[in-house]
From Swiss-Prot:
Family: Belongs to the eukaryotic ribosomal protein eS10 family.
InterPro entries the record matches: Plectin_eS10_N (IPR005326), Ribosomal_eS10 (IPR037447), WH-like_DNA-bd_sf (IPR036388)
CC terms in the record's Gene Ontology section: cytosolic ribosome; cytosolic small ribosomal subunit
N-terminal signal peptide: none
A Pfam family that the UniProt record links to this protein: S10_plectin
Cell location: Cytoplasm
A molecular function GO annotation: RNA binding
Main location (coarse class): cytoplasm
Keywords: Cytoplasm, Ribonucleoprotein, Ribosomal protein
A Gene Ontology biological process term: cytoplasmic translation
Protein name, entry field: Small ribosomal subunit protein eS10A
Chain residue ranges for the region called Disordered: 92-163
Biased composition (Gly residues): 105-116
Amino acid sequence: MFIPKANRVAIYEYLFKEGVLVAKKDSPIQKHSELDKIPNLQVIKVMQSLNSRGWVKEQFAWRHFYWLLTNEGIEELRRYLHLPPEIVPSTLTQTTRSNAVRPRGGPGGPGGGFGGASKTDDDRSNYRRGPGAYGMDKKGDVGAGTGRVEYRGGFGRASRYDN
């Protein structure tokens, strides 16, 4: 497939800048979602070419192609685009995180968990010893073992007492 050099260079530059490229597997799409003026089919074909050379690693999931730039691909694209070695894809750059002090508290510590001071062991034992805990009998006639089990025939079953 003939692809204009300007489109090919634009795809290479975007791939080198980001380090990854995504394209939907849908031929009728006229334009690629990230590269505005380049048809989606041309992006897919250029990336298939780079995959066959071993410059990118291809993955496919849920009707989308994902191409990841390999180390060999970084070197070759750097040479093709005449870029200095200081420029690297954004997937290889390290983000600087600010080491802001965040309050860290476990149970009973400062910050205490979900919404306030944590309960102590005394609070728990007082709750368990509250009214009706040990000495009082809650209703004795409720529960699973109070009634007599009765077998009755249901729909589509023979009665147990049919002979």
